[in-house]
Structure formats: C-alpha cells, structure tokens
Amino acid sequence: MLKIKGSQDAISNDLLLWSGVKTQVAVQEVYSIKVHPVSSQLNDGSAMSFNIPSQAKAMLSKVEIFTSFKVKKGDNNLTTEDSVSIINNIANAMFGLVQISINDRTELCQSMRNSYAYQTYFDNCLNCDLDRSDYLNAVSAFVMDSGVTKADAETMVFSGDGVKNKGAAKRAQRIAGSKTVTVCTPLHHPLFTTSKALPTNMKIRISLTKNNDSFLLLADSDAYNIKITDIYLKATFLRPNDIFLNLIEERLAKEAASYFITRPELILKPISESGRILRLNNLFSDGRLPKTAFFAIQRSKDFSGSSITNPYTFIPFGSFNLHVNGVPHFADPLETNYETKDGQKIYGDCWNFLKQLYEVIDKDKKGAGMINSTNFQQNFMVGVSLASDRSGITAGYLNQQMHASTNLTIDLGYDLNIAEDLLLLIFCHWDRVVKISGTREVEIIE
C-alpha cells in the first residue's frame, strides 16, 4: 500500500453511469460591434483613433483589426514586370505605432516606433504551430520568408536563376495586379488575449499609425506604395445572464479583478564595436530580469525600414553565452560551424541554437514551430529563460522577482562580412498583474 499513499480515490469512467454533462447558463448572448476610425484620413501619416463604446451589460472578449489595402507603382496598377512583395506579418506591421489606453489614463503599449511590428512577429513565430501556416496565410498573409542565406530573403522575389524567397513570392501573388487585399489579426496585447473578459463599462481607445511604405514592401526601388482603402475594429462582447452579471458587480465592488498577464517589451542595444567579438553589459534596466528573453541581431536600416531590405531577417552569429551574476547561463557557449552551399559560405549546423529555442518556447515535445530547420538561417535567434525554474513561455504561473547583473558575449563568426550599424534586439516577457476595480480604476503591478 506504500506506493499509493497520498493518492486520491478515483472511479473508472466506465462505471459512472449517471454522470452528467455540464450546461452553459452564464452567457446569455455574444455579439460584435464594428468600430470605424474617427477620421477618414487613412494614409496621411496621422494616427487613426478608434473608440470602443462601453457596454452597460456586456464584457469585452476580443478585438480584431480588419485592414484592406492595395499596392501600386506610383498611381499605376502593378504588372507582371513588377517584382515587389509585401513583408511578412503585414497585418500587424502595417502600423508603426500602436497605442491602447483605458479610461483615458492608463497606457498599455510600448511607445517606441515599430515595437508593435516586431513584438507581433515574435509572438506569431514563437507561439504558433507549423500546422497553422495555411490559416495564417489566408487570414493575415503571414508566410515565413525562406532561402539559403539572409541575402536570399532581402529584396527581390526573383533573382536570376529563379525564386529565392518562396515565402515572399507567395505573398506577392496576393497583391498582383494591385487587387485589394483584406487581412485580419487580433489586437496583440495580453490583456485582450487572456481567457478572461474585461468588465462592463470599460472605456477603451486604440490609436493606429500607418507604417512607412519602405518598411512594408520588398522591392528593388522606392517607386512602390501601399494604400489603406478601409480599416475597422471588430469588438466582440459577452453578455452574461443578469444574475451572473449582478454577482460579478457585487464581487468587483468588494475586490478588484486580477488579470495575470505578461508585458512584452522590445529592447534595442546599439552595437558600437566593430570587431568580431561583441560584449554587452547590464542588458536590463534596474537589473530586473524578465521571465524570458529572445536575442537577435539586426541592422539599423532594416529596423527603421528600407524597400531593399527585409525587417524580419536576422544576422546569424558563431557563438553565444550569457552570464548572470558572473555565472554562465550555458555550461558551454552555443556554437555553430560553417559550410559551403550553392557556392556561398553559410552557417551550417545550428541544431543547438534551435534546440535551445524550442525548449524555451515549449515546442521540444509538441511538434514544429513556425521557426524550424528550413528557415532558421533567416530567423536566427537565441531563446533564454531567466525565470528561477527556467520554465518556458507557456508556464501559467508567476515567478519570483529576480535582480542580477548580466553580461553577454557574442562571436559574430569567422571569414564573414560583418555589417556596420548593428542592433541587438531583445524581446522580453515580464510578469504583470492588471487589477480592475468596481469603479473601473486600473492598477498595474509589476
């Protein structure tokens, strides 16, 4: 009996002859509202503001962005002679700046330009499974870039001997002939993607600013432009049964509702060193460590946007290690080697980088992610869990707050041209609690 000490009693399911089925009685109705921008100016560079109307008896469950656009060459429609494509993640990258405020006081988003474009790209790449590829392509034109090297995914859809970037070629088919393309994406903020609905009578304002054409397009020149023809938000609400709604309001009057979410943040570290070995210290402000961090190297001109570069391809490197309070995070640095393919010298065996990434995003036991061995050259990054138990991004609990010094060492590699003007991109997740009271006061705790 020792082996079952501490175990709980159980009855086999085939003996439960009178077990019932749960009945949903709390939600009376689900409905959606289309929210159009306050101004009709969609392409003049100003912010497009959306005011989601508060509902007295319904709770906000989800917000989606629907955007219709066309790509043209000047004022002319595209022809078969034009080699142009949209970048990946266009449904989110369309907006260079996204601002979300609650009750006109609490700002929820990072204010840095293009932070939303990169955060959503990382979100999709790290959290979506490969078997969602067809859905993401159909709904949001999200198709991963491909090619042997980073250069293959940079600009042109076609390059001499044929298609180099098949992902870009697939996206180019959507815009051929300057036909109208409509894409849909959830509003990417943890407060709007959590399983909990927001209370009634919430005043929410969302501001979207269109990104630069040079950031959004892959082409051989700046002759092309992208115009938004229509845009609206779809806000979905749940209306509880009056009895449950009253119970919720009574509880809120006594105790604020807690939303345990994460705060995504994109940190940029300019790299001033011109040598092969990069060393950076004190990566996080105040020494406070995030729950997880993903490291990639990018060129400054790619981050700000240029038609002849791809913002969503990163620069590979030879080795990586992070020291926390002087202790190496990896017993041996993550390293790769080189090989020659199609006459080009490229990074070869990257399995330990991919293995580390899959462990942090919890894909090591759950199948392939959007980033895999076929496109890792374009999406070269390192995932690190800095939680006390080194748990992955899907861990559904808070970790102890940790403070530590950090020192990063990256070897860019041998015999490769080292680009100037490099940036270290760090995509972080921080634990955050948002409390909403009965008077709809919002408190953020980190």
Predicted regions and their residues:
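Short, low-complexity Pro/Thr/Gly
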Residues: M1-E446
